[in-house]
């Protein structure tokens, strides 16, 4: 029985992970759950899965959780604060750690788990976007194992030879006969919206993804295709890919989750229903397979598969992310921080949809920073970028 800690249990990835565990009660057991402030949902999860530990981001939320679990049979130990999160992420008993805390807040607990040589199921994008090289250096140093959870990176991983799977972040694609990684994306809900109407798009419209069920922040990122841009940055670190070894393709049906192009002309793809439980189950059971609970793909229900070149006028955030990846880790860290702040402002109706790309570019072009040499450097760059973004938004509002 594998013991699993879930960082970000009340979010979309966390709940999907618990669904996979529910489908495989003889294979996986929940050791610890970590969440932000959603005490109500955490209480439901604690009652259902009886973890040994539950950690909330602050004392108030932990107090609410204690009240909700009072007079129940749940014996979960309740903790709070960032130190507790880092401590729980590094528990000796854990066989696997699902890293699904959104944002740069997930970086330190993920590194704490790596330093204990854990098997990391990585859904937290920021770990690579802000510290990709530092991240994989730590993985190698401490003998940890990382498996990607994003559907695209997981699809690529499944399509790669074991020589690369066993040496993520360092192996040469060319040496294994690979010419390029083909990263697919749906194009989001505004794929066919006239360009002159984009500035009027609302948060609810941006969050209405045609294929995937996701949280609101990542749904907005999908609408701008910043999500694909961040995945592009991640993929370069995950698979040690150069700019010339990366391709981005819009695939509206989200059936082909990504592909790998080989020297001999072969293209290997991973396909299936757009359900995050598939990559989660794959990574949890690797190198074996287990039940995910996802519906099997019915080829006879598929009308057509489309492939479209990205339009960078429609998706300026995608273009900006690719540019940032060429500049280096400082630039991608700035972009990630700026985007988190400006998307939050959009969701709170402080800026327009089209302001997201404009503000992101202003912030990225404002900074000319040296490359980070430590996690503290990364966090300092992140802090500076957030402050600059907030100042620009304040001028607009």
UniProtKB/Swiss-Prot annotation:
Q: Which cofactor does it need?
A: Mg(2+); Mn(2+)
Q: Which Gene Ontology terms describe the biological processes this protein takes part in?
A: isopentenyl diphosphate biosynthetic process, methylerythritol 4-phosphate pathway involved in terpenoid biosynthetic process
Task: Fetch the Gene3D superfamilies from UniProt.
Answer: 1.10.1740.10, NAD(P)-binding Rossmann-like Domain
Enzyme class, UniProt record, top EC level:
oxidoreductase
Give me the residues that bind Mn(2+), please.
Answer: 150, 152, 231
Q: Give the metabolic or biological pathway.
A: Isoprenoid biosynthesis; isopentenyl diphosphate biosynthesis via DXP pathway; isopentenyl diphosphate from 1-deoxy-D-xylulose 5-phosphate: step 1/6
Q: Where does NADPH bind?
A: 10-13, 36-38, 124, 126, 215
Q: SUPFAM superfamilies per the record?
A: 1-deoxy-D-xylulose-5-phosphate reductoisomerase, C-terminal domain, Glyceraldehyde-3-phosphate dehydrogenase-like, C-terminal domain, NAD(P)-binding Rossmann-fold domains
Catalyzed reactions per annotation:
2-C-methyl-D-erythritol 4-phosphate + NADP(+) = 1-deoxy-D-xylulose 5-phosphate + NADPH + H(+)
- Pfam families xref list: DXP_redisom_C (PF08436), DXP_reductoisom (PF02670), DXPR_C (PF13288)
NCBIfam families per record = Dxr, PRK05447.1-1, PRK12464.1
The subunit field of the Swiss-Prot or TrEMBL record says: Homodimer.
Q: Which family does it belong to?
A: Belongs to the DXR family.
In Swiss-Prot or TrEMBL terms, this protein is called 1-deoxy-D-xylulose 5-phosphate reductoisomerase
State the species of origin: Proteus mirabilis (strain HI4320)
Q: Which gene encodes it?
A: dxr
């Amino acid at each position: 029985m594998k013991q699993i800690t879930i960082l970000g249990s009340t979010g979309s990835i966390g709940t999907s992970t618990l669904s996979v565990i529910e489908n495989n009660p003889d294979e996986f057991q929940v050791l610890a759950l970590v969440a932000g402030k959603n005490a109500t949902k955490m209480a439901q999860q604690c009652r259902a899965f009886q973890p040994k530990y539950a950690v909330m981001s602050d004392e108030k939320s932990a107090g609410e959780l204690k009240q909700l679990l009072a007079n129940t049979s749940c014996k979960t130990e309740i903790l709070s604060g960032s130190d507790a999160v880092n401590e729980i992420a590094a528990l000796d008993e854990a066989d696997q750690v699902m890293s699904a805390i959104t944002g740069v807040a997930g970086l330190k607990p993920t590194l704490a788990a790596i330093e204990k040589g854990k098997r990391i199921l990585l859904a937290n994008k920021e770990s690579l976007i802000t510290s990709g090289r530092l991240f994989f250096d730590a993985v190698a140093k401490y003998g940890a194992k990382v498996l990607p959870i994003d559907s695209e990176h997981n699809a690529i991983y499944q399509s790669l030879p074991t020589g690369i799977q066993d040496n993520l972040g360092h192996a040469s694609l060319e040496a294994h006969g690979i010419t390029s990684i083909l990263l697919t994306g749906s194009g989001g809900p505004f794929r066919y919206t006239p360009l002159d109407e984009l500035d009027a798009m609302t948060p609810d419209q941006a969050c209405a993804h045609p294929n995937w069920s996701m949280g609101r922040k990542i749904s907005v990122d999908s609408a701008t295709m910043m999500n694909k841009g961040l995945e592009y940055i991640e993929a370069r670190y995950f698979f040690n890919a150069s700019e010339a070894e990366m391709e981005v393709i819009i695939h509206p049906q989200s059936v082909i989750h990504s592909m790998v192009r080989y020297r001999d002309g072969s293209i290997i793809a991973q396909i299936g229903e757009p359900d995050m439980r598939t990559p989660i189950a794959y990574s949890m059971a690797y190198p074996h397979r287990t039940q995910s609970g996802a519906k099997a793909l019915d080829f006879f229900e598929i009308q057509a598969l489309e492939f479209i070149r990205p339009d960078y006028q429609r998706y300026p955030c995608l273009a900006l992310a690719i540019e940032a990846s060429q500049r280096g880790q400082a630039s991608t860290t700035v972009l990630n921080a700026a985007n988190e702040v400006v998307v939050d402002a959009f969701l709170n109706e402080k800026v327009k949809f089209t302001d997201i790309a404009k503000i992101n570019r202003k912030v990225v072009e404002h900074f000319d920073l040296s490359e980070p040499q430590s996690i503290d450097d990364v966090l300092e760059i992140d802090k500076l970028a957030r402050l600059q973004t907030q100042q620009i938004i304040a001028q607009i509002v």
